[in-house]
Amino acid sequence: MVFSKISQVAHYTPKQVISNDDLSQIMDTSHEWISSRTGIEKRHISTVEMTSDLAIRVAEQLLAGSGYDATALDFIIVATISPDASMPSTAAKVQAAIGATNAFAFDMTAACSGFVFALAMADKLIASGAYQRGLVIGAETLSKIIDWQDRSTAVLFGDGAGGVLLEASEQQHFLAEALHTDGARSQSLTSGQSSLRSPFSQGQEVNSFLQMDGRAIFDFAIRDVSRSIAAIIEQSGLAKEELDYLLLHQANRRILDKMAKKIGMPREKFLENMMHYGNTSAASIPILLSESVQNGQLKLDGSQHILLSGFGGGLTWGSLIVKI
């Protein structure tokens, strides 16, 4: 059988950093108010770089680290809710920029679960035996879809990108998977809504900015996502103690605190970096993954077990247990 493994990780964020104090200059908020409720202290906000620019920088790093030429790639998947345009896809722009002429490329829209969903799909592509390697990238410029007059959302989000190189392996590294969607609760978190505009249609005004029912999302994460994580750990056959770290979507420190108690695992096993980046949606998990390899917490030598879990708009939520 053919399996897949994560062989390279990388991340990139815009240079401009906006602190909570900076936000307090343009809206009614404060560092204490934001940090005490979310754990967020600052975020990176793009000045000129688009989502594809961030993703391209990640792709270039992944190739440089691997030693592969871009023509060796079979596919590129970019998870994003803030693409440069509806078409061409962000992934197509990455493919062109790095010269991956043999790769097919497409975007995946699953909000903050996007990277986990995309990684699960990429694992199946390689396991089919038809493809040898590809890039999976989460990239966002959420700053362009936020209403900067709405402090309930504007203080939460940031821009950035992260990704992995996935390639064929003789050993199994993806040990368990659980992906979920509940479209009946879709109105709890929305963005990019559009109206019919033809001369033959009856359009209506819509709010295209990101809108979120914070309490509903908080409750959803604590209830549904925690239950799913507990179930996938049991499904994997691993004892909780055998999981080295859990890398969850970086939405809110309070969510991680409550999840640790709900699942019954030590809080120190839940890695976090939302204090530096805010919520970067599909980019949050791969940025955290890359940073954790960079700082030595994760070895990338096949000796550790980690759980990746994303949750957000859709509603969507999904988890993977990976030997890394």
Swiss-Prot record:
GO terms for biological process: fatty acid biosynthetic process. Keywords: Acyltransferase, Cytoplasm, Fatty acid biosynthesis, Fatty acid metabolism, Lipid biosynthesis, Lipid metabolism, Multifunctional enzyme, Transferase. CDD domains: KAS_III. It is found in: Cytoplasm. The active site is at residues 112, 249, 279. Its main location: cytoplasm. NCBIfam families: fabH (TIGR00747), PRK09352.1 (NF006829). This is Beta-ketoacyl-[acyl-carrier-protein] synthase III.
